[in-house]
Amino acid sequence: MSHIDDLRAALADPPIEYRPEQRWWLAEGLHTDDTLRHEIDRAHRLGFGGMEFLAMPEESIDESRYGWGSEEWTHDSRTIVSETTARGMSFSFTSGTNWSNANLPTITPDDDAAAQELDVVYEDVSGSRDGALPRTELDAAYDGPDLVFERIPGKTQRFVAVVAAAVTRGVTGGEAADEGRAGGGDGPDGATPVIDVASLTDLTGLVTGEGEERALTWSAPDERAWRLFVFWQHGTGQIARPSASVNYTINYLERDGVDALTAYWRDVVLTDDLRANIAANPRAQMYMDSLELNLSGQAGMFWGRSVAEEFRARRGYDITPWLPLLVRRTPMMAVSTRYRYEGDAAHGVEVAKVRHDYVETLTDLYIDNMLLPFKEFLNDNGIALRAEISYGLPFELTRPGVAVDGIETESLEFGSQIDAYRLLAGPAHLLGRQYSSETGATTRNHMLDHRFYDQIIATQLAAGITKTVLHGWSSPRGAEGTTEWPGHEGMLPMFSERFDTRQPAAEFYPLWTRAVGRLQYVLRRGRPRIDVGILRTAHFTDNSSGMMFVDDEGRRTADEDKYGRDWMRARRNHWWRDLGMQDAGWTYEFFDPSYLLRPEAVLADGVLAPDGPGYQALIVYQEALGADAAARLVELAREGLRVLIVNGASELKRLETGEYTEHERAASRTPGLDGRDAELAAAMAELRALDAVAEIDDQAGTLDALRALGVTGYHEFAAPNENVLTYERRDGDLTHVYVYHFLYETGRETTVELRIPGIGAAHRLDHWGGRLHEAASRSDGGTSVVPVTLRPGEVAIITLDRSGAPAEAGAPDGAGSGDAGAAAPPS
């Protein structure tokens, strides 16, 4: 059977593993075996491919009997695993109760296995001071505007350090440029006080006493205003419900946390019967949602007993003297970080580098001490790890992709925005990971039509997201006295949606799930072909960019209006703001430069990672670039990889406040305080001298500059088109190009001529009917030209079958390199 015949056969009824899956909010452990079987059977009959299940708190319920960890919940979990496995469906555990983080009933805030933070107490010194050092108030209510979370404080704190600094005038947020934010500090009128960086003095060695009883005798060296920063470590006390006892959030930075987590799963959860069911299901998963780790202390810093030691080992200097300049407040997500103190202007770059080094170290520890050992444990037990890896916390966005089996994004925090989905596409494609999304959450439950959600899925497919997990499913049955029509909500009444049997649309779900399954089936075949990789390091990516729905006068704007008429649908992409490549039909995505140092980043046939995305060119635009990555760029460019240096580019910093980061000169310094700026400058000078490298000072010239370097899209439009997004898979003799008319509210019918290298028969997928129809095409040299007409919001997949073409008419090297068969891993 030929590839095209194999494709036709699979499209008639796509296998269950390609169907959309569901997040299932369970009313604690209240279900009976019969109701669980009923719900799973209904989901299966409607065509859903799997159930990601979690416990949600119910009012007036005895959590000691029904909460996470109880016998009732444990029994229900085993039943779900058994029943989904029996139907060929996947199942996904969560790493604790509800969705927010990994949490356990076996730890307390005073244990190293529980989440820890660094707290600070201030003392102003005029002249001399002598006596006990102030301690933090563990049970004090946090006075900031931060997101409210539940906590039960611990009883102990550990002395960490005391640092003195001369504090001078305040600055406004606009005066300080940094990777987080300035403003909202501890100075008068909310101004941010300025520290004389040269005055920072580590006094820890002068402290006497033991445990929590510490004292210091010290005299200020001059008459300036001096402040002592007294740092203490304690547990965050963050808890999660529902729990049969109390579940505390674990430590994500030190091995104590993951060791406690794996011990609990090994010794308590994974019984012999459960292990047998897991072994029978090839798609058993552990799912980790967006990282909702909260702090209550005044320093706002994630910490642990070994963080300072790890910082020194990894960054090469002592973090202690710099701690006052790391003190922060984070009103919501990491993007809202506000440093309470700024350094003087003369040391601005130095301070920014230290701040980068701190969050880079946090990322290292999250990867090494949480994700990698957890993944190893899960894989050893037949479970894959799927995770929303970084956003919301100051971890680098893409680097943790190396430590999971599946990389996930979501629609709630990123909206229906193609650039947001490109942010994590790079590591997914480079590593060959399944790229998925938690899709459908808004704050307008039961208010939006089905087309709205179809358009989110269509946008995500254009970035290579080929696994849709719907948000979500809830049984109509719920706790007596708290469940109202049209049924149990589970994920709070305001958050959409309920893709379950209560919906009138459920009548056509079998047709819909097959249609989505066909699209996902085709777009997982073979290898992705992405034209351009954009190097981007980000610890504070705005993951609230899909949630800010307020107009200039402070009035609420409906989600459907922002999704359908604003941002990308008003020609405003957030991170790569020039639209020239997109309008040409080219594809591009982002990843951290450290990926260039990985074994996947090999060059063959003029493309980077030919067994993955096959990038034909790389773009460098941010001011900060590591010296090792720059040296690797020189090697790659010498071997023929095209590199474009773009100066003067800007990217979104925070949508809510309208802030953008301006990159005056690309790769002009290293990110951290590593003393390698001169080494970077030398490497960039060498890079600029190479024939495969170009440099521009206007982002709008990107497409022309890449064409001048000899880049031709894997597929491209015969003429620019502002209505259509594309995504390509190379599948042996077949090339699949997904096309999507994304202006579903404001556009008109459009026809685009799609140029695909190679000569062959063109087909258009009818994803609703499961058929491939012959499509009109013509040849132009060695290229097939396929006209595609799309209505607003319509999607199509064009498949070019080159199996019957003469060898010389097949896809050429370069634009057609890197073919791979359908047996490739999903990415």
What name fits each language-model region?
Residues Y18-E21, T32-R37, M51, I61, ...:
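Carbohydrate-binding surfaces of carbohydrate-active enzymes
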Residues M1-D272, A276-R283, E808-A822:
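Mature N-terminal, pre-catalytic/accessory segment of carbohydrate-active enzymes
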